[in-house]
Amino acid sequence: MSTATFTLGIVGARGYTGAALITLLTAHPAIELIFVSSREYHGQPVAAHNPTYRGDLRFETLDPAAVAAKRADVVILALPNGNAAPYVHAIDATAPPTLIIDLSADTRFDPDWYYGLPELTRHTYTGQKRISNPGCYATAMQLAIAPLRDQLAGPPQCFGVSGYSGAGTTPSDKNNQALLRDNLMPYALTDHLHEREVSAQLGIPVEFMPHVAPHFRGITLTANLWLQRPLTREHIKILYATRYANDPLIDIIDPPPWVNQIAARHTVQIGAFTMALGNKRVVVVATLDNLLKGAATQALQNLNRALGLDELTAIPYHPKPPTSPLPSSPLAS
């Protein structure tokens, strides 16, 4: 007999993020996974696609009414952008107490939904049952900028590079390994959705230029920050370390972080802190796994907090710098 306290279902479980969610939830001591919805995998055992899951569940094809009828304590929507609304409306009508966590961008600009970037917004959580999970790039940008947000002299300029898993499983140029081989693919160089998301959340204009790289997972976000007054590198490092001192998933390191050191980890690494001549410009680099802290891990943080559990329940984190040697920046002060 299950000793789980809360029942949970995933809609859109076939994708990379859905798979990461199943892996995390399988190890959660207070969650019972009761359905996973996927049209492509309909009828197939979940265990056949995710070796960490050892139960008997099979993937189902569930329309919004069928999802609502399950009356799960929690529903996680891991759907492509533009598909969340019918499920939200059905749950609102049939099972309004259900906690909904939406991983798409559909609800990130809706003031009726709590925007769940725990390290920056947990103080505004007051028991909301509708939670919008931030975007992967948006998470990296906000964490890289926030400690200096009030000392900026102009819009942050952010250069982002993501592994192709960020483009999802539906075939496109951005996840075509043949096109990406020996390549870096720029796209949506102005007005990217995450640019608007970060600008709205931080309350300042942000400029963002995303690129897709040949590696599978992980984001490198380089933020160019102009300052109102000169600050020393040490002072800036202290600002970041102090801001995130009580956040176990945020790792402040000295050198620029490398994306291959963050893959399959639940933490964010922020480092470099490279000063330009005159100390009124600093370049900060953040890395995270787009499938974990950029999606599934963050959803689990939000779920845990909403259910009254420790925020890091079932998140296997090791918040310390990697042991592999990283090069120091030649421009660091």
From Swiss-Prot:
Alphabetized GO MF terms: N-acetyl-gamma-glutamyl-phosphate reductase activity; NAD binding; NADP+ binding
Keywords: Amino-acid biosynthesis, Arginine biosynthesis, Cytoplasm, NADP, Oxidoreductase
InterPro entries (UniProt xref): AGPR_AS (IPR023013), AGPR_type-1 (IPR000706), NAD(P)-bd_dom_sf (IPR036291), NAGSA_dehydrogenase (IPR050085), Semialdehyde_DH_NAD-bd (IPR000534)
Subcellular location: Cytoplasm
Record pathway: Amino-acid biosynthesis; L-arginine biosynthesis; N(2)-acetyl-L-ornithine from L-glutamate: step 3/4
Predominant subcellular localization, coarse grouping: cytoplasm
Keyword Cytoplasm: yes
Reactions performed catalytically: N-acetyl-L-glutamate 5-semialdehyde + phosphate + NADP(+) = N-acetyl-L-glutamyl 5-phosphate + NADPH + H(+)
Gene3D superfamilies to which the protein is assigned, alphabetical: Dihydrodipicolinate Reductase, domain 2 (3.30.360.10), NAD(P)-binding Rossmann-like Domain (3.40.50.720)
Similarity-based family: Belongs to the NAGSA dehydrogenase family. Type 1 subfamily.
Function: Catalyzes the NADPH-dependent reduction of N-acetyl-5-glutamyl phosphate to yield N-acetyl-L-glutamate 5-semialdehyde.
Protein's recorded name: N-acetyl-gamma-glutamyl-phosphate reductase
